[in-house]
Amino acid sequence: MKDLPGTLTEVNALRDGVFTSVGYDERVQRKASESEIKQLSASGKLKEYSIVHLACHGYFDKNKAENSSVLFSEVSGRLTGISREDGYLTIPETALLNLDADMVCLSACNTGKGDVRKGDGMVGLPRAFMVAGAKRVGVSLWSIDDEATAEFMTRMYRKVEKEGKSYSQAYREVKAEFRADAKWGHPYYWAAFVLYE
């Protein structure tokens, strides 16, 4: 997996420009691990977060949707010998998390894809996070541009945190802003972002 420099830009922009007046706990690079999120869940601390924002790689397995994942630091090999996890937080593992978040944002490629099954509906990460306790989940429907994602997420959270907008209203407004912007106007940059409520 290649590095995503925009994720650090994204996290820094959220910390410095959006979440300045609320409690904020940042886990980046080595601390952003599958092992860490599972430990937070097991201890009950993950349930204390009203927003869980994961800026990382996403993986969709078209042959076996249950293997679709959010990818953490272990995948890079940087935590070899430190973590027993493989770095792939799969759909079954996600559904077992202990969440009570108003928003889980998967700022990663292909996190909104799933497999539609008769009698079950869509098997995918959005549903797994909702089963785990998230009230809403923001995802992407395809591979997304790193820089555009950082800009989209920063604007979206600013509208929610600073302007008091709902998440759905913030998503609509940021998409409209992107459409009107010469740099971000192409649907590739904004249309992938959807919100499940």
Mark where each language-model region is:
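Catalytic cores of enzymes
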Residues: 1-197
